[in-house]
Amino acid sequence: MCYNRESNFANQTIDFYCYTEYNGFMTTKGANVMTEVEMKEQVQEVLDKLRPFLLRDGGDCELVDVDEGIVKLRLLGACGSCPSSTITLKAGIERALLEEVPGVVEVEQVF
């Protein structure tokens, strides 16, 4: 549950207080508010940068959805059946998305 104290929608910055069951109250000042469409576009850009590395090993990935910061990906080709796909997903793709796309909290594989 979040409560807006001050908003500046022209710059899409917001100062709000948020209560979560995980970490209690927290304050975020000047956080960028990104639409779901913008987040999907940024996620796709990062995936496009990573794609050559996946293709080199005979694999690929497809963006299925982004919902509340959770990126859902389908691993394709060799990546779909590779025993190392979890490592590729978590240590490679998820790490890159967490670093480069604000608001991403997790990456999940869908089948």
Curated annotation (Swiss-Prot):
InterPro entries: FSCA_dom_sf, NIF_FeS_clus_asmbl_NifU_C. Pfam families: NifU (PF01106). Keywords: Nitrogen fixation. It comes from Bacillus subtilis (strain 168). GO terms for molecular function: iron ion binding; iron-sulfur cluster binding. The gene is yutI. The keyword Mitochondrion does not apply. One of its GO terms (biological process) is iron-sulfur cluster assembly. Belongs to the NifU family. It comes from the Bacteria. May be involved in the formation or repair of [Fe-S] clusters present in iron-sulfur proteins. This is Putative nitrogen fixation protein YutI.
